[in-house]
Amino acid sequence: MYHTRVPETVEPATINDIVVTLVICKPYNHVPQPHERRALRIKPYWRFRLRGATTLIEMHSLFKCSADYGATMDVVETIPKLTDLNKFKYPSSFMFIHDTFYVPQHFYISEHSLSQLDMSKMTPMIDISLPIRKWMEKKKDQFGPVQVKDIIGIKVEDLVCRLGYPYVYVHQGSCEHVFYFTDLRLMDPQDYPLSFPQLLSDTSFEHNCKVCRRHTAQ
């Protein structure tokens, strides 16, 4: 038996929790072309370890995308301001998990970034899941009833989901990030709960071979 180091100050309430892995896949912001469909794969980009007490606001902040930090303007003569970034011009998003659309109603950013924003010039956040829900209502023979909830007050332990089943985060209108949960287990003292969410891996900078379009280029 190997000796393992156990933290001395771990609250019993912390141990009475769960740990689950969140896998976020490569985003797609366009309809794949025929040559792309042949090699289309759901490629994991990031893996995070979450605890049951992790809030959906914290989980929402883990979705990073280059589309958020672009600016749809002529930058030759004008230096983009923070409010010019797509993240703030088109801030609406949602996460669809099981049968529920989780829709943010407020900006969840750092106080430093918030202090630089003129809220009177900000694009108001809207429920971009509404057109999808209306479309689903027309196809009741194919879809069951769905719910809509704000992400405030929701924790990972409150979610109803299936391990390994794909869910989706949508932002910028049509940019989709497929994600799923795996490796659910009970927490133990060796998990060091103060560091959650934990980044387990990041392969977002790896590029596929241009020939096979499947394996990582060497």
Predicted regions located by residue number:
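Short linear regulatory motifs enriched in tryptophan with gly/pro/ser
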Residues: 1-218
